[in-house]
Each structure stands twice: as structure tokens, then as C-alpha cells.
Amino acid sequence: MAVQQNKKSRSRRDMRRSHDALTTAAVSVDKTTGETHLRHHVTADGYYRGRKVINK
């Protein structure tokens, strides 16, 4: 089993963890339907930037 040679300080540990924070997803509201969706993604009913791009 691997064992560290020297103890890592709180500062080094926290600097490593500084990139682990999660960000909230950018959500938009569709112009035509008012439905919320992820930015740069098609809505569930097939609209993207006010245009119907997928026919169901």
C-alpha cells in the first residue's frame, strides 16, 4: 500500500482542492415556449433559438 513520505500541509491540500468546486448549470428560457433548458442545447420539444429544429 502506498504511504506518503512527508505530510502535506493544509495549504497544499487546499490549493489542490481549489479546482474541485462545482458550478451551477447556465439555464435559459426559450423564447417561443417559455421552457427552461441548458444554454446552447435544444429544448425537450425541439426548439433552438426560437426555431423548430427537431420534428417529433
From Swiss-Prot:
Disulfide bridges in this chain: none
Region listing for Disordered, in residue ranges: 1-37
GO MF entry, a single one: structural constituent of ribosome
Keyword Nucleotidyltransferase attached: no
InterPro entries to which the protein is assigned, alphabetical: Ribosomal_bL32, Ribosomal_bL32_bact, Ribosomal_zn-bd
Spans through the membrane: none
Bias kind Basic residues: ranges: 7-16
Cross-referenced Pfam families: Ribosomal_L32p
BP GO terms, sorted: translation
GO cellular component: large ribosomal subunit
HAMAP family from the UniProt entry: Ribosomal_bL32
Protein keywords: Ribonucleoprotein, Ribosomal protein
Record-given protein name: Large ribosomal subunit protein bL32
Top-level taxon in the UniProt lineage: Bacteria
Gene3D superfamilies: Single helix bin (1.20.5.640)
The family this protein is said to belong to: Belongs to the bacterial ribosomal protein bL32 family.
